[in-house]
Each structure stands twice: as structure tokens, then as C-alpha cells.
């Protein structure tokens, strides 16, 4: 038996999908959201891929952009991955459901065990699922329903799975994330704090908590690529995006902070953790 939570963030590969021109128009722009600068969004996406590959040392796989899938870059919504198992989700928006096809094929090619959702009554967006290393929390939100959460529990039977009500338009991971194996980070909004309080009641494990001024700053990724002698990384929104949260993030002293920007991609509804899928194809020690 290893240390509880030690499986959190283990990764060798990252999967991303290129930004299509259609992201700047139609559904990709999002109703009522500001106009999106396509070139800037593509630059942000390119920098993210570079950080994953060069800074974190991950093997990067990039699916090509597809104009018929304007929100295709938000592939974090298309799968829930733990160990060698990938649960292919059923996004709330019917227009987004074809996004899972290319992701499924890529994960199959990497040797993961694929689990499908066959229940047409289920909805599940991957960014409503938070894995702590010990257990899963699934946000019951506009995007994910109780049947979707039940399928997460059926798929990952080795872990406790609890449901957390999420109010407003957010996904659970848009409100809180893991700053380390024992630390939950959360935004300061009422919705974020309500979610964290619910998690504290539901869990049997003691987590430290860190409140950040910005909800979007809590949408981060704790990653352990397993590089010799290198501490874990925290991929997070940088000072150019969220300056008010940087001082609080410095309190996470056990990680190497790796800032990235996705302020333009955010206009299409992207949070940081929605822009990539990370997985490990190495045996877990």
C-alpha cells in the first residue's frame, strides 16, 4: 500500500486538441460572451502545449482542430481518466457529443481501457469530476446529472464517489481543484465555498484548504510526471490572467508553480483543466 493520495497527478502523456477558426464564431463564441481573438486564443493554446511538453516533460499528443467541433479544444469534458481506465463522457450539450470520438480513438491507441456511457438519460461533463487521489467528487450542475455521477461510481469502484451540488453556470472544477495530495484550493465566491463545505462534510479524509480570490484560479492541475529529483508541478493561471490570486498560490510551497494564460480561451468557456487530458501509461509503483 502506498501513501494515500500518491496517485494524484501521476502522468506521462498529455492530450490536447487544436483551436479551430469556428471557435471565434457561432456556438464557439458562447452566447453573450465577448468577441474572441482567434489568433490570441491559438497562441495561448500553443504555449500551453509547449509548457506540457518542455517544462513538464510530458509526451504531447495533439489532435487536429475540427471546424465542425468549435469547442473541441475543451477536451477535458470528454473523458474521466484514472489509472488505465478512461470513462468516455456524455456531454450535456448534444452539439458537443461528437467531440468524444477523436478522444476515444486517441485513448484507445494509448492502451487505456475504455468505458462508454450507454444511458441516454445520463449527462456528464468531465470538468464536473474532481479526483483527489483518494476519492472522486462529482458536481451536480447544469452540465452533469445524478445518473452521470452514478456511472462515475460504477466505473471507478475502488474509490468513494460523492456528489456535490454546484450552483450557477460553473462546473465543479471551475470552482475548486487540488493544490496537492492533501490540499483543496477553492475560489472565494459563494458557489465555490458552498462546494468546499459540502466536500468537507462528505469526505472521510482530512484536506487542508486554501481560498483564492478568483474562482478561475482554483481550476488548476497538480501534476507529477515522475522526473527524477523534480518536485510536483502546479499548472495554474498566471498573473497576466488573475493577478489577485498569485500571492495566495505562493503558499503552495511543495510544488513548482507553472503559470499559463487562457484568458482568451476563457471567452469560449474554457477553464485551464478543460484544455488538456493527462494520463500515465507507465505502471504505478
Swiss-Prot record:
Where is this chain's protein located in or outside the cell?
Cytoplasm; Mitochondrion
Q: Which residues form the active site?
A: 171, 276
Its annotated function is as follows:
Putative hydrolase with unknown substrate. Does not hydrolyze N(G),N(G)-dimethyl-L-arginine (ADMA) which acts as an inhibitor of NOS. In endothelial cells, induces expression of vascular endothelial growth factor (VEGF) via phosphorylation of the transcription factor SP1 by PKA in a process that is independent of NO and NO synthase. Similarly, enhances pancreatic insulin secretion through SP1-mediated transcriptional up-regulation of secretagogin/SCGN, an insulin vesicle docking protein.
Which EC class is the enzyme in?
hydrolase
Which gene produces this protein? DDAH2
A GO term (biological process) for this protein?
Answer: positive regulation of nitric oxide biosynthetic process
Tissue specificity as recorded in UniProt: Detected in heart, placenta, lung, liver, skeletal muscle, kidney and pancreas, and at very low levels in brain.
Enzyme Commission number(s) from the entry: 3.-.-.-
In the record, the effect of residue 203 to D is given as: Loss of mitochondrial translocation upon viral infection. Loss of inhibition of MAVS-mediated innate response activation
What are the top taxonomic ranks of the organism? Eukaryota, Metazoa, Chordata, Craniata, Vertebrata
GO MF annotation, one? hydrolase activity
Record's keyword annotation contains Transcription: no
Q: What is this protein called?
A: Putative hydrolase DDAH2
Question: Can you name the source organism?
Answer: Homo sapiens
Amino acid at each position: 500500500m502506498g501513501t494515500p493520495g500518491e496517485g494524484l497527478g501521476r502522468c506521462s502523456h498529455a492530450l490536447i486538441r487544436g483551436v479551430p477558426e469556428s471557435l471565434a464564431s457561432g456556438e464557439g463564441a458562447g452566447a453573450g460572451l465577448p468577441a474572441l481573438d482567434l489568433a490570441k486564443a491559438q497562441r495561448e493554446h500553443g504555449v500551453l502545449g509547449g509548457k506540457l511538453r518542455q517544462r513538464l516533460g510530458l509526451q504531447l499528443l495533439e489532435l487536429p482542430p475540427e471546424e465542425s467541433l468549435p469547442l473541441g479544444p475543451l477536451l477535458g469534458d470528454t473523458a474521466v481518466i484514472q489509472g488505465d481506465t478512461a470513462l468516455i463522457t456524455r456531454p450535456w450539450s448534444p452539439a458537443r457529443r461528437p467531440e468524444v470520438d477523436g478522444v476515444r480513438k486517441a485513448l484507445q491507441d494509448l492502451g487505456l481501457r475504455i468505458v462508454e456511457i450507454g444511458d441516454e438519460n445520463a449527462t456528464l461533463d468531465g470538468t464536473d469530476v474532481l479526483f483527489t487521489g483518494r476519492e472522486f467528487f462529482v458536481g451536480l450542475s447544469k452540465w452533469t446529472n445524478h445518473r452521470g455521477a452514478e456511472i462515475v461510481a460504477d466505473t471507478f469502484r475502488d474509490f468513494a464517489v460523492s456528489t456535490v451540488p454546484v450552483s450557477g453556470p460553473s462546473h465543479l472544477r471551475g470552482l475548486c481543484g487540488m493544490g496537492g495530495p492533501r490540499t483543496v484550493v477553492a475560489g472565494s465566491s459563494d458557489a465555490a465555498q458552498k462546494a468546499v463545505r459540502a466536500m468537507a462534510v462528505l469526505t472521510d479524509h482530512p484536506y487542508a484548504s486554501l481560498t483564492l480570490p478568483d474562482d478561475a484560479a482554483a481550476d488548476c492541475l497538480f501534476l507529477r510526471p515522475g522526473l527524477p529529483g523534480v518536485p510536483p508541478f502546479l499548472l495554474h493561471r498566471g498573473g497576466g490572467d488573475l493577478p489577485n490570486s498569485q500571492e495566495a498560490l505562493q503558499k503552495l510551497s511543495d510544488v513548482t508553480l507553472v503559470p499559463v494564460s487562457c484568458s482568451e480561451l476563457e471567452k469560449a468557456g474554457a477553464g485551464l483543466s478543460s484544455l488538456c487530458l493527462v494520463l500515465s501509461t507507465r505502471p504505478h509503483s
